[in-house]
Amino acid sequence: ENKLNYYQPYKFQKSFHQAGSESNQRLLMAANRVGKSYVGAMEMAAHLTGLYPKWWTGKRYNQPIKAWVCGASNETTRDICQKELFGQPDNPRDKGKGSIPKHLIGETTRKPGVPNAHSSVMVKHKSGGWSRVAFKAYEMGAEKFMGESLDLIWLDEEPPQDIYSQCITRTLDRRGQVYLTFTPESGMTEVVQNFTSNLRPGQALITAGWEDAEHLT
């Protein structure tokens, strides 16, 4: 069954979505297993489809969007982000069991050399057009993050600073958004400090520990 229809966010997840109404850069910095990738996928699904829950007070796109979903490697992006959005990658019968309903999933392009991985997917937007989401991996290098103009980028797992900077640039033309979901495994990196030490207008930091995730308490 599709997850978007039944999404009841925890308080920290709702705060993260809500922050999108006034912040173009958001970081959900949270402990392992609290549902970071889940909330990231729910945010992406709502924007790709235009199907916003009744309680939604965050950013809204009233037209189809161009988006990227990015992770550390092609494999982790497939196993985490693609799975959360579209269902178990190695089981075709699972299509539509992620955050995006099956009947809204359109043309899918496979990623060469990575079994069961998507390169891009067309998603039907409620306005009638088609959104496009492409999958990227940090291991590809910053040069692979150049060129396109985008509405929305989700970075799941902490990116290198040069890739984060490229992603900000990619969204400037369209006044788009970049949001990050990760556990700070590498300490006080430049990316983390952007949000913890040097928070500027248009940025938001939401933190969560195990006590904030009701399924763990």
Task: Describe the residue ranges of each PLM region.
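Phosphate/NTP-binding elements of NTP-utilizing enzymes
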Residues: 1-217
